[in-house]
Amino acid sequence: MIKMVIVVRSDIKMGKGKIAAQVAHAAVTLVVSIINSNNLRWKEWLNEWLHQGQPKIIVKVNSLDEIISRAKKAETMNLPFSIIEDAGKTQLEPGTITCLGIGPAPENLVDSITGDLKLL
């Protein structure tokens, strides 16, 4: 199975609507970045993901450090990832990192980075 996982920071105060918007930003950013990339493997994964119902799992971490360390792991593994920074127009300071999106990619690869995390 191909899936996308969005990792949300739980150490910053965000309303439900803000969290939903940040998760949506991560998902859209990942898809657009893959479409605009030259990585054929990522494009294959995206196509499979689109035909599998676009599975998305939302999990949480307790710190910015956890977001950064997991992003570095995704980069090392050459997986699509996106770090989302808030624009600062409503609840948060500009540039606050709110979440990390990983995938779409094979479940076993994504799970090696996020499989230990609790669902949001």
Swiss-Prot record:
Cellular location(s): Cytoplasm
Quaternary form? Homodimer.
- Disulphide-bonded residues: none
Q: What class of enzyme is it?
A: hydrolase
Described function:
The natural substrate for this enzyme may be peptidyl-tRNAs which drop off the ribosome during protein synthesis.
Q: Which InterPro entries match?
A: Pep_tRNA_hydro_II_dom_sf, Pept_tRNA_hydro_arch, PTH2
Task: Please provide, in alphabetical order, the Gene Ontology terms of the cellular component aspect for this entry.
Answer: cytosol
KW Hydrolase (keyword) present: yes
Name of the protein described by the UniProt record? Peptidyl-tRNA hydrolase
Which EC numbers does the record give? Answer: 3.1.1.29
> Does Hydrolase count among this protein's keywords?
yes
User: Entry's NCBIfam families?
Assistant: arch_pth2, PRK04322.1
Molecular functions per Gene Ontology: peptidyl-tRNA hydrolase activity
The alphabetized list of GO BP terms reads: translation
Q: Which UniProt keywords apply?
A: Cytoplasm, Hydrolase
Tell me what organism the protein belongs to.
Saccharolobus solfataricus (strain ATCC 35092 / DSM 1617 / JCM 11322 / P2)
Q: Which Pfam families match?
A: PTH2
* Catalysis performed (reactions): an N-acyl-L-alpha-aminoacyl-tRNA + H2O = an N-acyl-L-amino acid + a tRNA + H(+)
- Its main localization is cytoplasm
Query: Which family is annotated?
Result: Belongs to the PTH2 family.
